[in-house]
Amino acid sequence: MDEILVVRGGNTVWDRRLGRVQQFDERSRQFGIRATIEAKRPRSYTWSCAPLLDQGTEGACVGFAWAHELAARPAVVPATELLARSIYHEAQRLDEWDGEDYEGTSVLAGAKATMARGHLKEYRWAFGLTDLILAIGYAGPAVLGTWWHEGMFDVGECGWLHVTGDRAGGHAFLVNGVSVPERTFTVHNSWGSTWGNAGEAKIGWDDMERLLHDDGEACVPISRVRPRS
């Protein structure tokens, strides 16, 4: 990681794949996920996501995270790399930065692009760790945008993410599982099957809370459009 790159918004990254740029809309505070979840007690649940897409070296992580979101239960949409890149480029046109000369875009723009394609009708936001635990347990998988730290590139044979080292850039990924006994989330990444445990990794609640508090965001679709059979 010795090459410094610039993505949209003027952010610098140490890895070309890190293309998530923060874009917060104050109006999002009116659309928290907690108001839609009646349950108060956390539960463990994993939303299966069969495809494992690989973004390659392109900073299209937002598009791939949203494609994985669509491919996961509860409303499965066939996901391909073409779909992921289509969402990514549409998000670039919808975000707050002019032009397409820079790589990267925001999770919010990805949500808008996914909605524009007719795949979902409504999305909400998880503001904090408890919101995310309840959202994954009851509502469905979430698309996260966080800082990616140097220590998160190497997850080891056990497939664990540890938030160590300096920030390397912003990354978007799917969180499709939560375990209450383990106090972990499951991350479904877009870096191929050789990363982590067949493309997935575990991250502890404490580390996740740190990421969320450090300009992190978690978008949760709550009204998905099921594809016609």
Annotate each PLM feature:
Residues 1-229:
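Catalytic-core signature of thiol
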